[in-house]
Amino acid sequence: YSHGYEKSLIVQDFIPGDDSHMRVLTCYSDQNGKVKMMCLGHVLLEEHTPKGIGNHAAIITEYDEEVMTKFKNFLESINYTGFSNFDIKYDTRDNSYKVFEINLRQGRSNYYVTGSGNNIAKYVVEDRVENKELELKIQKEPFFWRVIPRSVVYKFVKNQDLVNQCKKLASEGKEATSFGYKYDLSGNIKRSWYIFLYSINQIRKFNKYCK
């Protein structure tokens, strides 16, 4: 204010903890305001470049009935329709979850939802075009999504239990990457080369910025 700013200012409490304290919840509410899909992600790593900081880079889906019930009740109480995406952080000071915001859309890292078996396009078409009555789908099984090489996840995630879970899911084929669509890569040398260079660049970026 000493520099002449006169408008209101919001001061937000800083929640301690590294990337793995973050959670992301994506939901779909039908045209009647009823939640029909919920997928909670445990963020493992975020991007750390100056321009990309905060974007999710690796996620494991998880099930937390208490947390998901609270969000379901909230969305239905305001008769919300469409996609919703919540940024959440676990606060070790009082062992509670703190909600930063609700995005009125699917998130940038939304392929963690699709990859785990929840096709968001299908929900929209069946609800809005075909007017079907949808069943509630809550993602319960763990699934590993990433947009960076596995080696980066294994190196920079500090919680070894989470790293071991990633390795187990990868070995079981319960894993997806946003750049791993086989129909894009099959016979497409240029695209495959681009993904290879992208992966090398991600390794370089994390080594430089993620300390």
Where is each model-derived feature located?
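Peripheral (often C-terminal) accessory segments that flank ATP-dependent C-N-forming ligase machineries
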Residues: 126-211
